[in-house]
Amino acid sequence: MHTFGYRANALLTFAVTALAFICAIASFSDKFSNQNPSAEIQILNINRFKKQSHGNDEVSLTLDISADLQSLFTWNTKQVFVFVAAEYETPKNSLNQVSLWDAIIPAKEHAKFRIQVSNKYRFIDQGQNLRGKDFNLTLHWHVMPKTGKMFADKIVLPGYSLPDAYR
């Protein structure tokens, strides 16, 4: 007969293999969910647009953010990290991204929202490149599952521009 150690090892090996298989199936099942998030962002006000003492441009905005991210939630979703970034080009860099606002959405009930907020983080360009600049506001999200691979996506909202003169 087999000893207790051999039997415990066989049972533990089977349990770990079964758990790994169930986790793989759970992760794979997220691929079949229909995800169609929507978002709209409006700039309500440019609170401040100035040149800092050391030469960099700084902007403070009031944003109206409305989004419906409920379709990102499945039975396997733990939480969703969401943030708004301003994206623009300068002569030195083909893509500049500045995070303006972020939040963690813990449940599907909180995934449909509308807020008016000033940018949480400072919108500063390393130089004097923001006057008259066209830029996109992009809503990024990272879905954090209970098990499986984390994934990210975004909605790009183009057509925003800053004034030609400081305020």
Curated annotation (Swiss-Prot):
InterPro entries per record: SPC3 (IPR007653)
Principal location class: endoplasmic reticulum
Record bears the keyword Cell membrane: no
Transmembrane segments: 12-32
A single Gene Ontology CC term: endoplasmic reticulum
Segments in the Lumenal topological domain: 33-167
Subcellular location: Endoplasmic reticulum membrane
Membrane disposition: Single-pass type II membrane protein
GO biological process terms, semicolon-separated: signal peptide processing
UniProt keyword terms in alphabetical order: Endoplasmic reticulum, Glycoprotein, Membrane, Signal-anchor, Transmembrane, Transmembrane helix
Sugar-bearing residue positions: N136
UniProt entry tagged with the keyword Glycoprotein: yes
Parts of the chain on the Cytoplasmic side: 1-11
Assembly and interaction partners: Component of the signal peptidase complex (SPC) composed of a catalytic subunit SEC11 and three accessory subunits SPCS1, SPCS2 and SPCS3. The complex induces a local thinning of the ER membrane which is used to measure the length of the signal peptide (SP) h-region of protein substrates. This ensures the selectivity of the complex towards h-regions shorter than 18-20 amino acids.
Function (record text): Essential component of the signal peptidase complex (SPC) which catalyzes the cleavage of N-terminal signal sequences from nascent proteins as they are translocated into the lumen of the endoplasmic reticulum. Essential for the SPC catalytic activity, possibly by stabilizing and positioning the active center of the complex close to the lumenal surface.
Similarity remark: Belongs to the SPCS3 family.
Name by which UniProt lists this protein: Signal peptidase complex subunit 3A
Organism the protein comes from: Arabidopsis thaliana
